[in-house]
Swiss-Prot record:
UniProt-annotated location(s): Nucleus
Source organism of the structure: Arabidopsis thaliana (Mouse-ear cress)
Subunit structure: Interacts with HY5.
Main location: nucleus
Annotated protein name in UniProt: B-box zinc finger protein 22
Ranges of Polar residues composition bias in the record: 164-181, 251-260, 277-290
Gene designation: BBX22
Keyword Transferase: no
Length: 299
């Protein structure tokens, strides 16, 4: 791409005058800047990419200038450009151009050491190694002895029961899902497990409809006598109550009539019966079906 000279508008521009803000060819540049000494001091930037000389920064006069600020009309290096155009929002809005022939590349950013490093072999071993808590030697020996004793008890088919004193402990046979397997009476099991506060005849009254063979089988224990006495008392109460505890509404028969209909069979025991007086002849029969003797004819 070629830039046309702003003065003659015919030749190719070779320099850019920062003071005049114009692109000039070699002929126009010599003609304009040779007129007086003041014009000869104008800063001019070559537009040819093959130019080997790079002008210095107008601020520090040490580093090479890469940026041209249109408002300040000065060539600036990177350091001076940042220092000047970051003071306030007004100067940061200045238009700046990159000089011709300057190649721009991405600046490598040093990110520094990574905060999250890859896990080392030591970290991996620490993650995979299980946590083991150190146990004192006496406690460890006691724990091993207790664990070994529990294994032996499980192999023998017994489970530890309640402790009678500090040295000895009772052992109960294993209980299956159905019933107990062993010769220990039921009352001993209830005392061991603290079930003596319950009613001892609860199971017996629950199974009251079973056969008498269960009662004779429970006669071996001391509680069977209490169960039998409770059964006898229950039978006496049933006999006194008539054997039935259901409620019934008493039925009152219809009142008797003069014709003998609806007369009770045992009216002298009936509390509701009121006899009807129909004639002067005294009634001596005990039932309504009894016939009164015929009157004798008088001759």
């Amino acid at each position: 791409m070629k830039i046309q000279c702003n003065v003659c508008e015919a030749a190719e521009a070779t320099v850019l005058c920062c003071a005049d803000e114009a692109a000039l060819c070699w002929a126009c540049d010599e003609k304009i800047h040779a007129a007086n000494k003041l014009a000869g001091k104008h800063q001019r930037v070559p537009l040819s990419a093959s130019a080997s000389s790079i002008p210095k920064c107008d601020i520090c006069q040490e580093a090479s200038g890469f940026f041209f600020c249109l408002q300040d009309r000065a060539l600036l290096c990177r350091k001076c450009d940042v220092a000047i155009h970051t003071v306030n929002p007004h100067v940061s809005a200045h238009q700046r151009f990159l000089l011709t022939g300057i190649k721009v590349g991405l600046e490598s950013i040093d990110t520094g050491p990574s905060t999250k490093s890859s896990p080392t072999n030591d970290d991996k071993t620490m993650e995979t190694k299980p946590f083991v808590q150190s146990i004192p030697e006496p406690q460890k020996m006691a724990f091993d002895h207790h664990h070994h004793q529990q294994q032996q008890e499980q192999q023998e088919g017994v489970i530890p029961g309640t402790k009678v004193n500090d040295q000895t402990s009772t052992k109960l046979p294993l209980v299956s899902s159905g019933s107990t397997t062993g010769s220990i009476p039921q009352w001993q099991i209830e005392e061991i497990f603290g079930l003596t506060d319950f009613d001892q005849s609860y199971e017996y009254m629950e199974n009251n409809g079973s056969s008498k063979a269960d009662t004779s089988r429970r006669g071996d224990s001391d509680s069977s006598s209490m169960m039998r006495s409770a059964e006898e008392d229950g039978e006496d109460n049933n006999n006194c109550l008539g054997g039935e505890t259901s409620w019934a509404v008493p039925q009152i028969q219809s009142p008797p009539t003069a014709s003998g209909l609806n007369w009770p069979k045992h009216f002298h025991h009936h509390s509701v019966f009121v006899p009807d007086i129909t004639s002067s002849t005294p009634y001596t029969g005990s039932s309504p079906n009894q016939r009164v003797g015929k009157r004798r004819r008088r001759f």
